[in-house]
Amino acid sequence: MKRFDVVALGELLIDFTQNGLSGQGNMMMEANPGGAPCNVLAMLQKLGKKTAFMGKVGGDFLGKMLAGVVADAGINTDNLKYDSEVHTTLAFVHTYEDGDRDFSFYRNPGADIMLSADEVDESIIKDTRLFHFGSLSLTYEVSRLSLIHISEPTRLQ
């Protein structure tokens, strides 16, 4: 029997979303945990599935906050890495009146795209029923190469 139902690799970041206006009429922003792969895991965890996350955050206070939120949700964080040089990725989210959203990412680079192949524990892939990854991991070379490395058929068997 496999240890996990789903393991996800990808971005874990802060989504800043508008939460009202200040007394001066300026937009007030709220910091929320974000990143599609972890969002998927959080919902699966609520459905009683065993989940684990593989990714990277900054060693800053935001990265530590995210690690705590993910762990508190019951998601295994043994493969969550911290980058001491690159900050946690930020996304500013604008929601339109029709509910559509627009994202502005602040990562050049961001910690989530700095997960290298040598930081990925291949054994966890063999111990899961399903491996999920986010598309943003494919947009930057370091994280793309890590994903390609871990996704090779010999590692997924």
Give each language-model segment a name.
Residues 50-135, 140:
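Conserved N-terminal subdomain of the carbohydrate kinase-like
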Residues 148-157:
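Single conserved hydrophobic/aromatic residue that forms the stacking wall/gate
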Residues 1-76, 115:
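Glycine-rich phosphate/adenosyl-contacting loop at the front of the ribokinase-like
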Residues 145:
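Glycine/Thr-rich phosphate-binding loops that ligate phosphate moieties of nucleotide
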Residues 44, 139-141, 150:
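Low-complexity, intrinsically disordered/propeptide-like segments
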Residues 3-5, 89, 102, 153:
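A residue-level signal for beta-strand positions that form part of recognition/binding surfaces
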